[in-house]
Amino acid sequence: MKERSTELVDGFRHSVPYINAHRGKTFVIMLGGEAIAHENFPSIINDIGLLHSLGIRLVVVYGARPQIDVALEEQKISPLYHKHTRITDSKTLEVVKQSAGTLQLDITARLSMSLSNTPLQGAHINVVSGNFVIAQPLGVDDGVDYCHSGKIRRIDEEAIHRQLDNHAIVLIGPVAVSVTGESFNLTSEEVATQLAIKLKAQKLIGFCSSQGVVDASGQIVSELLPNQAEERIQALQTTGDYHSGTVRFLRGAVTACRRGVERSHLLSYQADGAIVQELFSRDGIGTQIVMESAEKVRRANINDIGGILELIRPLEQQGILVRRSREQLEMEIDQFTIIERDNLTIACAALYPYQSEKIGEMACVAVHPDYRSSCRGEVLLQRISTQAKQMGLDKLFVLTTRSIHWFQEKGFTPAEIDKLPIEKQALYNYQRRSKILILDLHKE
C-alpha cells in the first residue's frame, strides 16, 4: 500500500486562495540574460507555463546583456559605454540583433514544448512577438552619440491586451523599431517597467543571482518600500555595482511601484520553483517592493472574530491565555488590535482601560507560531501604548504566566496586586497566580 503524504495536500490547499487571486491578472516577467544562461532556466520556463495554465496573463521580457558581451568578444569588438549605458554602433547593433533573435527563438521553442512526462505536457501555449514597442534614439549626451541605443517612445498596449485576451504569452525582447524603420537596442528593465505601467499590471517579477535583497547579516529582506529600495540602490552603486540583476531590477521596481504597479518581486534564478513559492505562499521566498506593506496593523472589527479565535485557541488550550468565548469576544472586539497579513490574522492584543485610575490592561497578546521570531509583539506593544496615551492613561499592566522576561525587556516592572485597579483586584485569579507587571508610559 502506498504511503499517504499530506504535504502535497496541505500545500495545495494553502495555495488555492492565491490561485484564485491571481487568475485573470496581468504579470510582467523580466528575464535577464543571466537567468537565461543559467542551468535552471528550463525550470523557470516550466513555471511560466504553469502560471499560464492557471489563467494568469503573462508578458515575458527578456534581456541579452551577457550573450551580447560574449558575441562581441568572439568578434573582437570592444564594448563601449557612456554613463554605464552601452553605445550601440552599427557593428554592435548587428550583434545585438543576432543575440536577441536567437534568444527569442529559443524561448519560444521552450514554451512551445508539449512532450509527455514534462510539466508543459498538453499545454499548447501560443507565444506572440511583434512590434508592440516603438523606440526612439537616446541621442547625444555630453558630446557622445549613443548611436542605436534607444529608449521607448510608445507602447501599443491595446494590441498586447488583445493577445492576452486570446490566451497567448506575449514575448518582447530588447530590440525595437522606430517610426523611421531603424532598430534600437533597449534595456530589458526599461521595457519591462514601462510595460508593467502601461498594461496596469498587478505584478512585475524579476530575477537575480541571489534570493532577493539581503541585509548586513545575509538574511533576505522580504519587503521594501520605494524609499528603502532607493537606499539599497545607492549603497550598491557606491561599491561600483551598476549592472547587477539586483540593481537593474530595483530601479525599475521603484518606478513601477510609484506608477501604480501593486507589487514587484525579485527572485533568484538559481532556486528551483522560486516563482511558484513566491506567488503561491503567504511569505514568499524573495523580496517584494510595495507602496504599502502586505501587513496591516489595525483595530479589529466583528469580521475578525473568527481569525482571532483561531489564533488564540491553541494558547488557551495550553493555559497561556485565559479562555474567551465567542460571545465575550463579540462584546469586547472594539478593544482588540490585530496584525493582518494577506487576510490572515497573525497577531492580536487587547487594551482594557480603567479611566478613573488612569491605567490600562494589555491582554490577550498572541502571535502566530510562524511569526514569533520577528518583531510583531513589539509592534503590538507600541500600538497599544499609543492608544493608551491617547486615552490619557499613565500606565499599562499585564498579567502573564509565561512571558515575564519578554515584558521586562520592554520596560515593564514587577508589581504587587495592590497596584492593580480596584475592580481588577477583585477579579484576580489566585489559582492561576499570574505575575503582575506594570509599564510607566511616560518613561518609555
From Swiss-Prot:
Record's protein name: Amino-acid acetyltransferase
Record domain N-acetyltransferase: where: 295-434
GO biological process annotation, one example: L-arginine biosynthetic process
Keywords attached to this entry: Acyltransferase, Amino-acid biosynthesis, Arginine biosynthesis, Cytoplasm, Transferase
Pathway: Amino-acid biosynthesis; L-arginine biosynthesis; N(2)-acetyl-L-ornithine from L-glutamate: step 1/4
Top-level division of the source organism's lineage: Bacteria
Lineage: Bacteria, Pseudomonadati, Pseudomonadota, Gammaproteobacteria, Enterobacterales
Cross-referenced Pfam families: AA_kinase, Acetyltransf_1
